């Protein structure tokens, strides 16, 4: 029997309302016991004194670029970033080449991630064949192969009849539709429509591009009974629309990218193309509304939208590929809300663990007895810098490059096996 004890840590597990100093006994990859002063002579010991111990983090929005664009990232490099950031499970988006609209690609991803053996990689399937927005993909075979949700992420589904059909099918299968809400007739530009786009003379992406689609798909979710999950929510009005539907009992959830909590559109003036992302960084009032949405529970989870691009793809704002890496910086970014007294550590951990697990319908994000021993151990006060030495991605596109970050994962354990040590 393989046995491991995580000793002396401060354990926080929102799924069980558990908080305090405990030891955790792991046996054969499962949580065996949580108690004070566990003694098992033959067990391996991890001393977590002074550290936070919680369920393994789950990121339900990651771009691994594999297959097809592995010069930016691949399953191995992305998995290394994930475990360094405390993520034991990640959900990969289907805008690969070829896209995840067939079981061959699903099997490739699952087999390669198993071979890498770091974090759990769960694929999503496309809503439409080729992500072209016209013909529904084969949801049944994709789910059977291992897809946990469906999305055309990176592109909106503009045809309302297609989205309605997708929600109906997903409802039958008990999986969510992950919704990239940007009306492409209003979101054809580069950065947020506002003072910075005017100052720089750049084409813009109107906030109503997001808001209109959220309203439409909230109505469709209400009519079909399907679960719509709004990706990377970014505006104040978007949150008000989501709250409206939640109050009516509609199956609607949403995520926020930590970058939208940290930065406004003005970050483009500092970081240039590394601050270009879709949906774009918004105004201060939107950022503050998102923070309030986290505090009030309107926003269900954090999700990085980890989107790697090479330096040559990020040279000029107007021609740059949109996206920011985030797997290694998610924890210190979210901890800024804790340090400012906006949310508790328990709330922060809830948004990284049990909440995303519930959204995708997996029995993870918990330390309950018998569950997979996915454990993240972190120091909320350790300072570090994201640079050439610490970055594990193939790409470096983030406004946080070279910045001092506070909060560091020390150990990541997946299925009882240590997959990362600082």
UniProtKB/Swiss-Prot annotation:
A GO MF term: dihydroorotase activity
Binding site for substrate: 63-65, 95, 278, 309, 322-323
Protein name: Dihydroorotase
Pathway: Pyrimidine metabolism; UMP biosynthesis via de novo pathway; (S)-dihydroorotate from bicarbonate: step 3/3
InterPro entries referenced in this protein's UniProt entry, alphabetically: Amidohydro-rel, DHOase, DHOase/Allantoinase_Hydrolase, Dihydroorotase_CS, Metal-dep_hydrolase_composite, Metal_Hydrolase
Species, as recorded: Aquifex aeolicus (strain VF5)
Cofactor: Zn(2+)
Role of this protein: Catalyzes the reversible cyclization of carbamoyl aspartate to dihydroorotate.
Annotated positions binding Zn(2+): 61, 63, 153, 305
Upper classification of the organism: Bacteria, Pseudomonadati, Aquificota, Aquificia, Aquificales
Keyword Metal-binding: yes
EC number(s) reported in the record: 3.5.2.3
Keyword match Hydrolase: yes
Subunit description: Monomer. Forms a 1:1 stoichiometric complex with PyrB. The complex exists as an equilibrium mixture of heterohexamers, composed of 3 PyrC and 3 PyrB subunits, and dodecamers. The complex has both DHOase and ATCase activities.
Active site: 305
Family recorded in the similarity comment: Belongs to the metallo-dependent hydrolases superfamily. DHOase family. Class I DHOase subfamily.
Cofactor binding description: Binds 1 Zn(2+) ion per subunit. Fully functional with a mononuclear metal center. Does not require a second metal for activity, although the conservation of the second metal-binding site during evolution leaves open the possibility that a second ion might bind in vivo.
Enzyme class: hydrolase
NCBIfam families for the chain: PRK09357.2-5 (NF006844), pyrC_multi (TIGR00857)
Effect recorded for residue 180 to A: Does not affect activity
A biological-process GO annotation: 'de novo' UMP biosynthetic process
């Amino acid at each position: 029997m393989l046995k491991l004890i995580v000793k002396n840590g401060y354990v926080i597990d929102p799924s069980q309302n558990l908080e305090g100093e405990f030891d955790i006994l792991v046996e054969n990859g499962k949580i065996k016991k949580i108690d004070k002063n566990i003694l098992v002579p033959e067990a391996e010991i991890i001393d977590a004194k002074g550290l936070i111990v919680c369920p393994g983090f789950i990121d339900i929005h990651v771009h691994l670029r594999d297959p097809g664009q592995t010069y930016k990232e691949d399953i191995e490099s992305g998995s290394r970033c994930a475990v360094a950031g405390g993520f034991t499970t990640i959900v990969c988006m289907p805008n690969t080449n070829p896209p995840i609209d067939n079981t061959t690609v699903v099997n490739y991803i699952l087999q390669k991630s198993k071979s890498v053996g770091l974090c759990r990689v769960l694929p999503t399937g496309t809503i439409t064949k080729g992500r072209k927005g016209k013909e529904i993909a084969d949801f049944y075979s994709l789910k059977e192969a291992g897809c946990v949700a469906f999305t055309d992420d990176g592109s909106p589904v503009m045809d309302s009849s297609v989205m309605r059909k997708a929600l109906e099918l997903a409802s039958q299968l008990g999986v969510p539709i992950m919704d990239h809400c940007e009306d492409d007739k209003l979101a054809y530009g580069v950065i947020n429509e506002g003072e910075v786009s005017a100052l720089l003379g750049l084409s813009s992406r109107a906030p109503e591009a997001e808001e209109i689609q959220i309203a439409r798909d909230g109505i469709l979710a209400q009519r079909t009974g399907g679960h719509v999950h709004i990706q990377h929510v970014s505006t104040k009005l978007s949150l008000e629309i989501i709250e409206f539907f939640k109050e009516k009992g509609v199956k609607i959830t949403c995520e926020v990218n930590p970058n939208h909590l940290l930065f406004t559109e003005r970050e483009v003036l500092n970081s240039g193309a590394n601050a270009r992302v879709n949906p774009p960084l918004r105004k201060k009032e939107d950022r503050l509304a998102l923070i309030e949405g986290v505090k009030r529970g309107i926003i269900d989870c954090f999700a990085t939208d980890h989107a790697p691009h090479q330096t040559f793809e990020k040279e000029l704002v107007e021609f740059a590929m949109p996206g920011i890496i985030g797997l290694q910086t998610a924890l210190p970014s979210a901890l800024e809300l804790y340090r400012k007294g906006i949310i508790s550590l328990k709330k922060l951990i809830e948004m990284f663990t049990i909440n995303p697990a519930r959204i995708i319908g997996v029995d993870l994000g918990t330390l309950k007895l018998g569950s997979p021993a996915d454990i993240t151990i972190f120091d909320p006060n350790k300072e570090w810098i994201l640079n050439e030495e610490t970055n594990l991605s193939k790409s470096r596109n983030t406004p946080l490059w070279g910045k001092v970050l506070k909060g560091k994962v020390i150990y990541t354990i997946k299925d009882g096996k240590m997959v990362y040590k600082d």
